[in-house]
Amino acid sequence: MKERDAAPAERGKPATYTGDKKAKMAAKTNKKWVRLATVFAYVLSVSLAAIVLAVYYSLIWQPVGAGTSGGAAGPPPGGSNATGPSGTSGAAAAGPNTTGSSRREAPRDVPPLQAARPAPPEPPADSPPAGPLERPRGPDEDEEETAAAPGSR
């Protein structure tokens, strides 16, 4: 009889006396509390990591322009990295060829399309100078462009 008192009932067997039943109930309750505490700690740690990342990306991180060629690296002259020159969003002000990817790339000295393109041939001296192909602009359009981007030229 003492052998049965010393060893608790094995898993799956019904408890044969009151002390064994209480021990099983206590072990089950302890397992539930340990599982609940583990889940709570996991949720708390993931939430804390999300808060830290949100604070970092909203207050500390400053994006690096991918198309800069030989300028001083730093924040844009507008003062804020969230808006562009005329109040547009940072993604719209970055340029037409940028993507919304969250991947951060190292800045390049020369954009790849300009590096691969050969220099244009010199025009003959007797032909009139040919400028880039774009539509002619009126005087008010030039004023709007210079007002929208004061440091671009």
UniProtKB/Swiss-Prot annotation:
Entry's transmembrane regions: 36-56
Short name of one Pfam family: InaF-motif
Keyword field: Membrane, Transmembrane, Transmembrane helix
Biased composition (Pro residues): 118-131
Region annotation (Disordered) ranges: 1-24, 66-153
Topology versus the membrane: Single-pass membrane protein
Keyword Disulfide bond listed: no
Biased composition regions of type Low complexity, renumbered to the chain: 79-101
Compositionally biased spans, kind Basic and acidic residues: 1-23
Top-level taxonomic group: Eukaryota
GO cellular component, as recorded: membrane
Name of this chain's protein: Putative transmembrane protein INAFM2
Protein source organism: Homo sapiens (Human)
